[in-house]
Curated annotation (Swiss-Prot):
PROSITE patterns, per database record: EF_TS_1, EF_TS_2
Molecular-function GO terms, alphabetical: translation elongation factor activity
Region (Involved in Mg(2+) ion dislocation from EF-Tu) residue spans: 76-79
UniProt-recorded name of the protein: Elongation factor Ts
Cytoplasm keyword on record: yes
Keyword hit for Signal: no
Annotated Gene Ontology cellular component terms: cytoplasm
PANTHER family from the UniProt entry: ELONGATION FACTOR TS, ELONGATION FACTOR TS, MITOCHONDRIAL
Species in which this protein is naturally found: Mycobacterium leprae (strain TN)
Stated family: Belongs to the EF-Ts family.
Record's function text: Associates with the EF-Tu.GDP complex and induces the exchange of GDP to GTP. It remains bound to the aminoacyl-tRNA.EF-Tu.GTP complex up to the GTP hydrolysis stage on the ribosome.
Protein localization: Cytoplasm
Chain coiled-coil ranges: none
Length: 276
């Protein structure tokens, strides 16, 4: 008896872009293990794996204040442009900045004006007629560069980045370098600060995919270590902030430009509306 359902096949197809028969076949091969099925399709070359996993139907905005960042979701971009919706988001991020609360459940119980955050969201949702959701929050307490990006001029910011950093001796250069790093993260979607921050399970998965892809392409066994190393270096270049080529000078990495300004990035966070 199959350890998966038709819904699993459809979900795998939506996630990977692979054909229905391929999805069914790989679920049979993996005995219904969804994660292994996704990895198997990546090895076989299915398109857009992982990218669709990050997508969601949610609209909304990100808001920032004093080192704090939130994502507030709604159902349509029409509501995202609503002045009351944007006002509520700014009030909530003000609560995060003042009370240093990032746990969403705890934040819902915090006060905003004469009501809780949860009550304020529920009241506006009833008035507007759409489901509203406070999705996540973050705050950094050190020196922070903030960048907000709009997808369109008539929409509120949909991408928000916080970069916590140690400044160099030249304050102006440090501020500019940190802001550039924030813009870099917004544009190229770095996932990790350095190689040391990449979880071992992620590295293991990337190694396995690189090796299996090379084998499937008929590469000789003795060449596999070099091929895997090359693919891992490509992964680091794409996913690790300090190893990415700068969007301002692609002959230099982000690390080189930060070092030139005497800036040390300690951590960052990136929120994008509707994405993981």
């Amino acid at each position: 008896m199959a350890n998966f359902t038709v819904a699993d096949v459809k979900r795998l197809r939506a996630l990977t872009g692979a054909g229905m028969l391929d999805c069914k076949s790989v679920l049979v091969e993996t005995d219904g293990n969804f994660d292994k099925a996704v990895e198997s399709l990546r090895i076989k070359g299915a398109k857009d794996v992982g990218k669709r996993a990050e997508r969601a139907t949610a609209e909304g905005l990100v808001a920032a204040k004093d080192g704090a960042l939130i994502e507030l979701n709604c159902e349509t971009d029409f509501v995202a442009k609503n002045a009351e919706f944007q006002k509520l988001a700014n009030q909530i991020v003000g609560v995060v900045a003042a009370a240093k609360i990032v746990d969403v459940d705890a934040l819902k119980g915090a006060s905003v004006g004469d009501k809780t955050v949860e009550q304020a969201i529920a009241e506006l949702a009833a008035k507007i007629g759409e489901k509203l959701k406070l999705r996540r929050a973050a705050i950094f307490n050190g020196t922070v560069a903030t960048y907000l990006h709009k997808r369109a001029a008539d929409l509120p910011p949909a991408v928000g980045v916080l970069v916590e950093y140690g400044a160099g001796t030249d304050a102006a250069n440090s501020t500019a370098a940190a802001h550039a790093a924030a813009l870099q993260i917004a544009a190229l979607k770095a996932r990790f600060l350095s190689r040391d921050d990449v979880p071992e399970d992620v590295l293991a998965s990337e190694r396995r995919i690189a090796e299996e892809t090379a084998k499937a392409a008929g590469k000789p066994e003795q060449s596999l270590p070099k091929i895997v190393e090359g693919r891992l270096n490509g992964f680091f270049k794409d996913s690790v902030l300090l190893e990415q080529p700068s969007v301002f000078d692609n002959k230099k990495t982000v690390k080189v430009l930060l070092d030139e300004a005497g800036v040390t990035v300690t951590r960052f966070v990136r929120f994008e509306v509707g994405q993981a």
